[in-house]
């Protein structure tokens, strides 16, 4: 058994999330986490809403609310959407908790004490019309490296390089288009050059990463410069140093604090586990260390899931923070109270999802929100599309015609039809799983196929090849469908022994396929598991709890959590024998067939949304 940390990118609370977001961080991380739990590993899946930074401040001003009011609103929207999609977080929290503030400030103080957070004078942008600070990501211009006209003041999304706003060609404000004025300002910088040797040595051992992630990360080593980790802004975590902590206009950079969220969420999870246990016993408030502190004899692995625009922060900034905290750069140093912390085992980056050939854009109305999708369609239909046709290793396109086709042809007519006709024949002819007679070669062959699927699909999931994994699982479904068609049980009414054997074999094969598909289709999997008389929980669902801030009783907020292994019997990743005599009721359709009309209806919704914003 391994301790598996599933660290999932934190969605930003400047609005509801669309399906492109969950295709990058959400569904892939949940598929992996569900499989690893079923395979017997101790999984800790954590994330939360990212609530600091300039976009929150600007949007709050536009809406006439405080940043906290804005993030409170969208935190609840995002929590509901991700829970309804079935994302099985052990803890989904937020970055405005007192716990998160304390963990981030401890990290900053220790990195600073070890000599890797250095104070420098830099050029900051001012809006000439308002006299206010203009944060770097609200400045755009032409990238001095690749020439892309649309680069931000902190990063070029075209070439992925980190930038300084003052280096942009023809810089302009994204708020009103004016040219900013640059003045001197003081900031703390993460000294990446002092951590370069340790960072490079670690990265060169990551040969198992996806090539696009590894190559991009290694290329970043060619131009390592100190990176500003504070900002001229009044919304964020205070800088925890004398002379800085009381300055209302200086805050920690949102990306410095966001990546630390994986650690702070793990700590909050452990504290809540202790609280739920009555403050004593196991698990306790230090339980998070089993995933984070290197421990001899304990296999610990950490997987970070995100879209490709966040690779830099997870393969460079976060590892550099961890190395600086441990004192493993050129200046040495000692770890802080959390001890040495594990570096990422793997950074799992997805590419971008587009829709109908266009980039998602909420401002232009080119968007399909998760909550709208789930209001009209089954969550497993969206999960399946992302798994089988999502942007795993290259950009992919979501179209309504393809969504309808895959739902109808593969889920309804393929997997759903197999479940329905098998259960219907068992119910009609026996009312329960029949006792099998002697199996023929054709029966043994189909069971050998389904049982082989556990190793094959599992191997693909462990190596982050989810598209190949779900394709293989559906290939096995096709073999079982072929078996039922070729054995023709509907023609065996006068041969009860043979009919019983075929239907027992088919039921066993369907049960096996259901386990193979459970990480991808958890809602359907649990329904099918129960319909076939299965015991225990095959695909546990998350729940939303309203909790009080652990360090501020005046604040409450929703979290996503669940009982996925602890306190429940989780069906394992293996073939479990169906039991003769188990009652089988007449089934209801598992998946809903989509009418051809939905394609034009959804396209019209998108056109109307775009017209409103034109």
Swiss-Prot record:
Ranges spanned by the short sequence motif 'HIGH' region, renumbered to the chain: 11-21
Motif window: 'KMSKS' region: 359-363
EC identifiers of the protein: 6.1.1.10
Cystine bridges: none
Sites where the protein binds ATP: 362
UniProt cross-references to InterPro entries, sorted A to Z: Anticodon_Met, Met-tRNA_ligase_1, Met-tRNA_synth, Methionyl/Leucyl_tRNA_Synth, MetRS_core, MetRS_Zn, Rossmann-like_a/b/a_fold, tRNAsynth_Ia_anticodon-bd
Keyword vocabulary terms for this entry: Aminoacyl-tRNA synthetase, ATP-binding, Cytoplasm, Ligase, Metal-binding, Nucleotide-binding, Protein biosynthesis, Zinc
Gene Ontology molecular function, alphabetical: ATP binding; metal ion binding; methionine-tRNA ligase activity
Cofactor or coenzyme needed: Zn(2+)
GO BP: any one term: methionyl-tRNA aminoacylation
Compartment(s) of residence: Cytoplasm
CDD domains for the chain: Anticodon_Ia_Met (cd07957), MetRS_core (cd00814)
Keyword flag Nucleotide-binding: yes
Cofactor comment text: Binds 1 zinc ion per subunit.
Subunit composition and interactions: Monomer.
Cited function: Is required not only for elongation of protein synthesis but also for the initiation of all mRNA translation through initiator tRNA(fMet) aminoacylation.
UniProt similarity note: Belongs to the class-I aminoacyl-tRNA synthetase family. MetG type 1 subfamily.
The protein, known as: Methionine--tRNA ligase
Organism from which the protein derives: Beutenbergia cavernae (strain ATCC BAA-8 / DSM 12333 / CCUG 43141 / JCM 11478 / NBRC 16432 / NCIMB 13614 / HKI 0122)
Lineage: Bacteria, Bacillati, Actinomycetota, Actinomycetes, Micrococcales
């Amino acid at each position: 058994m391994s301790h598996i940390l599933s660290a999932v990118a934190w969605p930003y609370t400047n609005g509801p999330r669309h399906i492109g977001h969950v295709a990058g961080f959400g569904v892939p991380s949940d598929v992996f986490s569900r499989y690893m739990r079923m395979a017997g590993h101790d999984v800790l899946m954590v994330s939360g809403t990212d609530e600091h930074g300039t976009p929150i401040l600007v949007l709050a001003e536009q809406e006439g609310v405080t940043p906290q009011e804005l993030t409170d609103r969208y935190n609840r929207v995002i929590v509901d959407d991700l829970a309804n999609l079935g994302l099985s977080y052990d803890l989904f929290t937020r970055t405005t908790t007192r716990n998160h503030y304390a963990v981030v400030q401890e990290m900053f103080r220790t990195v600073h004490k070890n000599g890797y957070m250095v104070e420098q004078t830099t050029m900051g942008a001012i809006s000439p019309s308002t006299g206010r600070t203009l944060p770097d990501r609200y400045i755009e211009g032409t990238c001095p490296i690749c020439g892309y006209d649309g680069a931000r003041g902190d990063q070029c999304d075209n070439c992925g390089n980190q930038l300084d706003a003052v280096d942009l060609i023809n810089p302009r404000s994204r708020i009103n288009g004016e040219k900013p004025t640059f003045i001197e300002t003081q900031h703390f910088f993460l000294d990446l050059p002092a951590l370069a040797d340790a960072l490079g040595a670690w990265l060169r051992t990551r040969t198992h990463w996806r090539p696009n992630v590894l190559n991009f990360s290694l290329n970043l080593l060619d131009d390592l410069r100190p990176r500003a980790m504070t900002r001229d802004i009044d919304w964020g975590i205070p800088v925890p140093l004398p002379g800085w902590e009381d300055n209302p206009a200086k805050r920690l950079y949102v990306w410095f604090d966001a990546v630390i969220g994986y650690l702070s969420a793990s700590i909050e999870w452990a504290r809540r586990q202790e609280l739920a246990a009555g403050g004593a016993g196991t698990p306790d408030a230090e339980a998070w260390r089993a995933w984070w502190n290197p421990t001899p004899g304990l296999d610990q692995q950490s997987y970070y899931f995100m879209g490709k625009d966040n690779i830099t922060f997870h393969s460079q900034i976060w590892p550099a923070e961890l190395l600086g905290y441990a004192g493993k750069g050129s200046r040495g140093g000692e770890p802080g109270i959390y001890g040495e912390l594990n570096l990422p085992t793997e950074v799992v980056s997805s590419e971008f999802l587009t829709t109908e050939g266009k980039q998602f854009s909420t401002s232009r109305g080119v968007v399909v929100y998760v909550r709208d999708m789930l209001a009209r369609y089954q969550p497993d239909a969206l999960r399946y599309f992302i798994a089988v046709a999502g942007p795993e290793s290259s950009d992919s396109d979501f179209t309504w015609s393809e969504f309808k086709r895959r739902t109808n042809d593969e889920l309804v007519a393929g997997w759903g039809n197999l479940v329905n006709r098998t259960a219907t024949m068992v119910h009609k002819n026996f009312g329960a799983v029949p006792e099998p007679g002697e199996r023929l070669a054709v029966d043994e062959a189909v069971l050998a196929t389904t049982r082989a699927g556990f190793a094959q699909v599992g191997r693909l999931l462990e190596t982050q090849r989810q598209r190949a994994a779900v394709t293989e699982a559906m290939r096995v479904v096709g073999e079982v469908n072929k078996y039922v068609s070729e054995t023709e049980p509907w023609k065996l009414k006068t041969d009860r022994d043979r009919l019983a054997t075929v239907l027992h074999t088919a039921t066993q094969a369907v049960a096996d396929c259901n386990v193979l598909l459970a990480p991808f289709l958890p809602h359907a999997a649990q329904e099918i598991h129960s319909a076939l008389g299965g015991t225990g929980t095959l695909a546990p669902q998350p729940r939303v709890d309203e909790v009080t801030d652990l360090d501020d009783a005046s604040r409450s907020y929703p979290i996503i959590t669940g009982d996925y292994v602890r306190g429940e019997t989780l069906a394992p990743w293996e073939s479990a024998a169906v039991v003769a005599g188990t009652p089988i009721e007449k089934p209801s359709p598992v998946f809903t067939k989509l009418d051809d009309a939905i394609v034009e209806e959804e396209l019209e919704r998108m056109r109307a949304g775009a017209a409103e914003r034109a």
